[in-house]
Amino acid sequence: MTVDDSLSPAGVATPHSSGIRVVVVGLGIAGLTTAIECHRKGHTVIALEKSPVIRVLGDSLGLGSNATNVLEKWADGKILQQLKSLADDISIFEALDSAGKLYAKDDAKGFGADNGMIINRGSLATTLHEYAKMLEIDIRFGAAVTGHWEDESAAGVIINGEQRLVADCVIGCDGIHSKTREAVLTKEPTAVPSGQAVFRASFDSTSVCNDPNARWILAEKGVRDRLSQYMAEGGLALSLATGKRGQNITWQLWHEDNHNANELWSEHNSAKLENALGMIRHWPIYSKVVPILRHTPKEALTDFKLVNRAALPTWISHAGRIIIIGDAAHPVLPIVGQGGGQGIEDAATVAICLQLAGKTHISLALQAVERLRYARTSIIQSSGPKIYAGVRNPDWKAIEKDPSLIMLPRPKWIFGYDVPRDVYEQFPLVKRAIEEGSSYTPKNIPPGGRYEFLHDFKE
């Protein structure tokens, strides 16, 4: 009996062999990964992006080992190695008070160079785009989706109010302010401001090298990177890090939202460095860190509003041929470090479910995606406010006794997850549950289905 090697976690199908035509809307990290994963599983992809070029806004993001486990299967590992060459080499996380006293030090397991990565968003998006082009995926820029449609046999979009595209399904990866979500939900979900915002910036370290008062941060340049988090009461915290072994400086200042922050990376106009510095001017460590922060280029700084969103009632349209994934379905607060990773997990899941269900069962495939992903992403999404609450007013005496109280949780069920293997193993069970109308409990969630502060992931 011949075994189809494409029906395996690392398997690659013959291009266009499934007969399934997919429209991917939005080419952020989730959208680019979806386009690539769908191509690898034999689907014909049309990928649409309203911007004229790949957007490179934003600073760094973390991809845990659960995300890089997907990327490592591309081109025999070459793409992941290319990304790692562009990534930061953060091997130490430090937690300090506003005077600079060190209370906790942690390795970067889950995000370290051996498995995950911390990488500039622009570098990641550009590399994924180049790989998608190499695969000859149909990518169309300047293609704003102005409408959606579906019936029992097909689905599609209207581009720029004129062109009508026909496909078997539409996958909306168009982010927090998703247009595709309008085709799924009868009303836009309520976004609840968290009361917090974060100044964010990333820039080249060259000018810092020449500043005797600032270059202390580059003491390990060429060797490794380090992330130091200075924390005070009231949720005020400064994260200061080097990147690419000292080639870059990245910093974030978490603070109370003064209503000047914006939830769009493209909005830099209201972000003023002096406003950020004024918030920490009373810190004992101020005179040490301010020389570094003053090198921030005006165009590199943004003040990003943090918004809480509850899990959506569904990700799938009424006729079952349009689905939203990634930030369009389950945006995650940045403190969790899983926004990009969960989008990548979604991408792998939807590509495999379409492959296993086949062209005549598109609706079943998308239902399977939701059943496999919904509980996991909802639990991870809910962890953001909990993690933030844990560091908002640090109890330094308790932390001195138990440093894990202040460190980012690294649960094994998140970081040790192998999404391709799980989807191939679980799809028959999910399919049966859908066909029988019975319940299905995914295997990718923690016992009890609740988020807990765990540090049980081991590399």
UniProtKB/Swiss-Prot annotation:
InterPro entries: FAD-bd (IPR002938), FAD-dep_Monooxygenase_BioMet (IPR050493), FAD/NAD-bd_sf (IPR036188)
Matching SUPFAM superfamilies: FAD/NAD(P)-binding domain (SSF51905)
Organism, as annotated: Aspergillus nanangensis
Function as written in the Swiss-Prot or TrEMBL entry: FAD-dependent monooxygenase; part of the gene cluster that mediates the biosynthesis of the benzazepine alkaloid nanangelenin A which contains an unprecedented 3,4-dihydro-1-benzazepine-2,5-dione-N-prenyl-N-acetoxy-anthranilamide scaffold. The first step of nanangelenin biosynthesis is catalyzed by the indoleamine 2,3-dioxygenase nanC which produces N-formyl-kynurenine through the catabolism of tryptophan. The two-module NRPS nanA then utilizes anthranilate (Ant) and L-kynurenine (L-Kyn) to assemble the dipeptide product nanangelenin B.
Top-level taxonomy: Eukaryota, Fungi, Dikarya, Ascomycota, Pezizomycotina
Protein name: FAD-dependent monooxygenase nanF
Positions of FAD binding: E49, G62, R121, D327, G340
Pathway(s) this gene product operates in, as recorded in its UniProt entry: Secondary metabolite biosynthesis
Cofactor(s) in the UniProt record: FAD
Cystine bridges: none
